[in-house]
């Protein structure tokens, strides 16, 4: 007896056929004369019926949920259809039933989603410990199958566009890329280490030097950094690189690719082209370089209105950002939003309610001298609440931008659909206050804007990068740039970052030498596939779209990793554990 059909694939067209099915018992019901079994496989479930006269009846009496069985029977119309199931108009009258494996009772239910009912969530730690059971749930299987469709759509599209898939090494050299490396000791020479790649950045650029022209890879990457909802120590990205291109070429191709992915994987049509904002404009209007465009609530710069106001907090601030909310907020709500602002380095959150003919509450008395101009600038109306953050330009924007997001929750604003945008014209460098040095916004291989090259040493903070981020619903899902292909320019950028010639040779010598053999202009991008899939599925965490993820501490409750290793193995590697 071999399987002839998936249980979830049976329809009215199969009525009258004898079928053999294999899968798990989702639920068992004994009605005193008939026994009903719901048989589940990856395609769904179908109802099986065992009559007392059937040879299958004795086995049906003893099976329990999650047992693995093989069933044989005749497909017939179901007397009472179940509209919640795709197979709800048919059932299988059993002639044979064989137990392939018995099962313990799972520590949490896995059956509800397959019946079209709401799934009850167990604790995440329990789900991760028994991940193989968690993956039996319908939603989790749908997430993994969507992941498959997305990757297949990427492959199909890029293959048609002339891209070549190339695997790059997992064991490579430790180079500074912004996060800590995972190190792998080299057994043959204690004291030497490989590093797991944080990205295939240098290898894909060298593939362009090699003349491959168009490369892509579904790449595994590793970063030893603090974890949060959208981070894992090991993660997956779509990595691609193109030769002889400018910014427009990369953006246009990626828009078409993303539209293809959403069409094939979700049946959703994305409007093209995606809107674009400069980094400066995104920060000014939304207080974020990854703004959520699914709702309005734009920030307004109102500092100039208060230059002669006498309200010193606003008068002396570099920037005063204002946000009009279409609600008269309570003091409790204002206090909650003020805490958000303070967490983002603001000194406080000023506020006032807009009334007919004036303001009330908070800093109302300081606003009266500029009332007309302020209402015009913020487009506030009676019944609204005005919120203000004053301070350094970046702090004011970032803090009120964070308030904007929390306010959208308080107001119950709808955040539906998929709103993409490109953020472009990033600064090449930013000043690190703690280190008192310039550091890169993206990575040190990003090309400066050609128009800004004269400023590189004179005024580095004003140099724009040929860099771009792809943002979806307020989340960065991709980032890339045109790369530096001139070894002399690359050396200049390294020097600006405080990387001297000796350190350049030690850490990047192989790459700088490659550039000296004729590198084409090139650029590319990397998508965070896990983040993208979490957004496509409406999941709260990327752990929901990864088969076997780590928990928030970077540990695996299923396998117990990371775990101690024998002393003998450490000695072989020339290692000794020193506990802090």
Swiss-Prot record:
Protein purpose: Catalyzes the attachment of L-aspartate to tRNA(Asp) in a two-step reaction: L-aspartate is first activated by ATP to form Asp-AMP and then transferred to the acceptor end of tRNA(Asp). Is specific for tRNA(Asp) since it aspartylates tRNA(Asn) 3 orders of magnitude less efficiently than tRNA(Asp).
Record carries keyword NADP: no
GO cellular component: cytoplasm
Family: Belongs to the class-II aminoacyl-tRNA synthetase family. Type 1 subfamily.
Organism: Thermus thermophilus (strain ATCC 27634 / DSM 579 / HB8)
Name of the protein: Aspartate--tRNA(Asp) ligase
Record keywords, A-Z: Aminoacyl-tRNA synthetase, ATP-binding, Cytoplasm, Ligase, Nucleotide-binding, Protein biosynthesis
Record's catalysed reaction(s): tRNA(Asp) + L-aspartate + ATP = L-aspartyl-tRNA(Asp) + AMP + diphosphate
Protein's gene: aspS1
Entry EC no(s): 6.1.1.12
Assembly notes: Homodimer.
């Amino acid at each position: 007896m071999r399987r002839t059909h998936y249980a979830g694939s049976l329809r009215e067209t199969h009525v009258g056929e004898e079928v053999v099915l294999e899968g798990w018992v989702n639920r068992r019901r004994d009605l005193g004369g008939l026994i009903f079994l719901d048989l589940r496989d990856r395609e769904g479930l179908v109802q099986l019926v065992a009559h007392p006269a059937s040879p299958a009846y004795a086995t049906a009496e003893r099976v329990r949920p999650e047992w693995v069985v093989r069933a044989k029977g005749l497909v017939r119309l179901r007397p009472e259809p179940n509209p919640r199931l795709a197979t709800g108009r048919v059932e299988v009258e059993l002639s044979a039933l064989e137990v392939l494996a018995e099962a313990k009772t799972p520590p949490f239910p896995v059956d509800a989603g397959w019946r079209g009912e709401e799934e009850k969530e167990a604790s995440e730690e329990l789900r991760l410990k028994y991940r193989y059971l968690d993956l039996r749930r319908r939603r989790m299987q749908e997430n993994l199958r969507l992941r498959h469709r997305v990757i297949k759509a990427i492959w199909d599209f890029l293959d048609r566009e002339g891209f070549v898939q190339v695997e790059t090494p997992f064991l490579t050299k430790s180079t500074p890329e912004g996060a800590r490396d995972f190190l792998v000791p080299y057994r043959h020479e204690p004291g030497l280490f490989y590093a797991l790649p944080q990205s295939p950045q240098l290898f894909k650029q060298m593939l362009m030097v090699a003349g491959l022209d168009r490369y892509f890879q579904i790449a595994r990457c590793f970063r030893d950094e603090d974890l949060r909802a959208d981070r894992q120590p090991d993660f997956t990205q779509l990595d691609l690189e193109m030769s002889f291109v400018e910014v427009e070429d990369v953006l246009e191709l990626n828009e078409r690719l993303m539209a293809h992915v959403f069409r094939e994987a979700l049946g959703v049509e994305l409007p093209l082209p995606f809107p674009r904002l400069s980094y400066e404009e995104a920060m000014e209007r939304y207080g974020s370089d990854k703004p959520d465009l699914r709702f309005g609530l734009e920030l307004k710069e109102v500092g100039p209105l208060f230059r002669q106001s006498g309200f010193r907090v606003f008068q002396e601030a570099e920037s005063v950002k204002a946000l009009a909310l279409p609600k008269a907020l309570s003091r409790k709500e204002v206090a909650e939003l003020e805490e958000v602002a303070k967490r983002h380095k603001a000194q406080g959150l000023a506020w006032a309610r807009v009334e007919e003919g004036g303001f009330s509450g908070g800093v109302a008395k300081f606003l009266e001298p500029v009332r007309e101009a302020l209402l015009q600038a913020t487009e506030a109306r009676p019944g609204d609440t005005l919120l203000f953050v004053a301070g350094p330009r970046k702090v004011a924007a970032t803090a009120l931008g964070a308030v904007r997001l929390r306010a959208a929750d308080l107001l119950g604003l709808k955040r539906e659909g998929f709103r993409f945008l490109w953020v472009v014209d990033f600064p090449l460098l930013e000043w690190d206050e703690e280190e008192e040095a310039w550091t890169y916004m993206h990575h040190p291989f990003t090309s400066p804007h050609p128009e800004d090259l004269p400023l590189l040493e004179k005024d580095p903070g004003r140099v724009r990068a040929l860099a771009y981020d792809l943002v979806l619903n307020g989340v960065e899902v991709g980032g890339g740039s045109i790369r530096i292909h001139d070894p002399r320019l690359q050396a200049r950028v390294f020097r600006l970052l405080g990387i001297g010639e000796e350190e350049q040779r030690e850490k990047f010598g192989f790459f700088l030498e490659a550039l000296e053999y004729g590198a084409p202009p090139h650029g590319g991008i990397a998508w965070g596939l896990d983040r993208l899939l979490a957004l496509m599925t409406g999941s709260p965490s990327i752990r929901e779209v990864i088969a076997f993820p780590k928990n928030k501490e970077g540990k695996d409750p299923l396998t117990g990793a990371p775990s101690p290793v024998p002393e003998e193995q450490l000695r072989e590697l020339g290692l000794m554990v020193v506990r802090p």
